[in-house]
Amino acid sequence: MAFRIPFAQSFWQEYLSGQEANLPRLPEVEQVTETVMRILGGNPGRMQLQGTNTYLVGTGKFRILIDTGQGEASWIEALTKQLEANGLEISHVLLTHWHGDHTGGVPDLITYNPELSSRVYKNTPDLGQQAIHDGQKFHVEGATIRAVFTPGHAFDHMCFLLEEENALFTGDNVLGHGYSVVEDLGTYMTSLTRMADLNCALGYPAHGTRIEDLPAKMKEYIQHKESRMRQVLAALERSRARMTATGGGRRAGALTFPELINSMYGGIPDEIEQALTPFLSQVLWKLAEDRKVGFEGEPSQRRWFAVGPPAATAVRL
């Protein structure tokens, strides 16, 4: 079994802290379009930006709820206030993925309305939840939502396509500000391509403001990840070139995680190195899957090296 450094949100707090700066203020509740109402989860932070976006979707009495926030009292209060003031009911609860800032409000929902216990849908559902399948459709007045399986940020991640607006609820795969973190970069890149191929005009992210030009945002995300992969590969190729010049063999210039980080960024504090290591791990495994890098040694002392011709001179077949 391949060794990968486990995803740990605490390591990413430093990495994401810059995304907090200069974030636009979002109202607690906003009728974004005739069909979509956004209700903030009341959980702002480095990982959650202004807080988790939850969405009531539809134009009639019955609405579809996408995500449930983290379980903050302010969220369930804001949601139930909107339901009761407008005579609304929830027909389905759709969860984008398993992370607690998206599923944490489910118990409060069921306390508010026990009938909702049989209307909670998630890919790879927990006990008592209903399964979501790729391509499955959910209907209420004014809204037809199609589920799109897009793993990578999380193994069970789903996006939801709102047909009436040609809009995509992007979950945590694509954010309104900055970039997301991932569990599996190779799978995530495949999902980004699938999302881009849907050609949706607008994006409703799980964190941040509405994405007004989703095709441009998808292109930006894909290019950003590809750029990081090129940077890592270039660092390994530079190390190989230096060692080959002194008579090294096929695995010349192999580097450990700390050595690679030092090669790319120089001396950095330990906490920043910890923040970079999970992301770097995902990049290296993606490059290994693409057969651009190899590795040797036991997991705790694994060393990585470039294989094949340098990227700048590689022959395209």
Swiss-Prot record:
GO terms for biological process: secondary metabolite biosynthetic process. Disulfide bonds: none annotated. It comes from the Eukaryota. InterPro entries: LACTB2-like_MBL-fold, Metallo-B-lactamas, RibonucZ/Hydroxyglut_hydro, Sec-metab_biosynth-thioest, WH-like_DNA-bd_sf. GO terms for molecular function: hydrolase activity; metal ion binding. Zn(2+) 2 binds at residues 101-102. Binds 2 Zn(2+) ions per subunit. Its cofactor is Zn(2+). Keywords: Hydrolase, Metal-binding, Zinc. The keyword Methyltransferase does not apply. The active site is at 101 (proton donor/acceptor). It catalyses: 3-(2,4-dioxopentyl)-2,3,6,8,9-pentahydroxy-1-oxo-1,2,3,4-tetrahydroanthracene-2-carboxyl-[ACP] = 2-acetyl-3,4a,8,10,11,12a-hexahydroxy-1,4,4a,5,12,12a-hexahydrotetracene-1,12-dione + holo-[ACP] + H(+). Its EC number is 3.1.-.-. Pathway: Secondary metabolite biosynthesis. It holds the Pfam family Lactamase_B. The keyword Kinase does not apply. Zn(2+) 1 binds at residues 97, 99. PANTHER family: ENDORIBONUCLEASE LACTB2, LACTAMASE-LIKE PROTEIN APTB-RELATED. Belongs to the metallo-beta-lactamase superfamily. Lactamase-like protein; part of the gene cluster that mediates the biosynthesis of the linear tetracyclic TAN-1612 neuropeptide Y receptor antagonist. The decaketide backbone of TAN-1612 is synthesized by the non-reducing polyketide synthase adaA via condensation of one acetyl-CoA starter unit with 9 malonyl-CoA units. The FAD-dependent monooxygenase adaC then performs hydroxylation at C2 while the polaketide chain is still attached to the NRPKS adaA. This is Lactamase-like protein adaB. It comes from Aspergillus niger (strain ATCC MYA-4892 / CBS 513.88 / FGSC A1513). The gene is adaB.
